[in-house]
């Protein structure tokens, strides 16, 4: 990884080491609701002592003692009758994930993702994808590639990913 890019990515951790970033992340987590993690702490439970919980989380992040908890595994049915495993993180882990997402997303949107990619991106949806396709067809392009990598997330080489992240 080139040094300027590496610096941009790795300075993100420092950007979440403040109560404002954690509060903003908390607002997203609360709005998304969601079930409790392995610690059985609900959104309502966490909110009862919000300031104390966020301060404690911030302290652990600053002291680099924060460790994510295991996820609570549940299975949801797929259309084909099979079951899809779903990992539910704890509230505090969701807050850290959201804080990092808040800081990383603008970088990836600008520097990494292709403008024509519309899947799972803020402000982009199937309707925009169709408009982009129609625009390209009107411009003279006549091929469209649509693909779905089956089991993509299940097959990410985690050792390689962790090596890149470290």
Say what each PLM segment does:
Residues 1-51:
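Non-catalytic, polymerase-adjacent accessory regions of viral genome-replication enzymes
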Residues 162:
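Conserved S-adenosyl-L-methionine
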Residues 49-52, 56-59:
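Intein modules and their embedded homing endonuclease domains
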Residues 31-44, 68-95, 112-124, 145-146:
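Short, conserved non-catalytic motifs in the polymerase core
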Residues 2, 11-14, 104-158:
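Active-site-proximal segment of RNA-dependent polymerases
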Residues 17-27, 60-83, 91, 95-104, ...:
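Reverse-transcriptase-like RNA-dependent polymerase core
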Residues 165:
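Carboxylate/His-rich catalytic cores and anion/metal-binding grooves
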């Amino acid at each position: 990884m080139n040094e300027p890019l590496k610096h941009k990515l790795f300075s993100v951790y420092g950007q979440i080491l403040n109560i404002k970033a954690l509060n903003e992340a908390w607002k997203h987590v609360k709005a998304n609701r969601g079930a409790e993690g392995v610690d059985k702490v609900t959104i309502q439970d966490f909110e009862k002592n919000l300031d104390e919980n966020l301060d404690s989380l911030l302290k652990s992040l600053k002291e680099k003692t924060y460790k994510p908890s295991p996820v609570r595994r549940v299975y949801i049915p797929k259309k084909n009758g099979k079951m899809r495993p779903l990992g539910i993180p704890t509230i505090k882990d969701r807050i850290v994930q959201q804080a990092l997402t808040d800081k990383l997303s603008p970088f990836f949107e600008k520097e990494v993702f292709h403008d024509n990619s519309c899947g799972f991106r803020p402000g982009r949806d199937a309707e925009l994808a169709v408009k982009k396709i129609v625009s390209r067809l009107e411009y003279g392009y006549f091929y469209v590639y649509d693909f779905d990598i089956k089991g993509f997330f299940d097959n990410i080489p985690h050792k390689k990913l962790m090596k890149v992240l470290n």
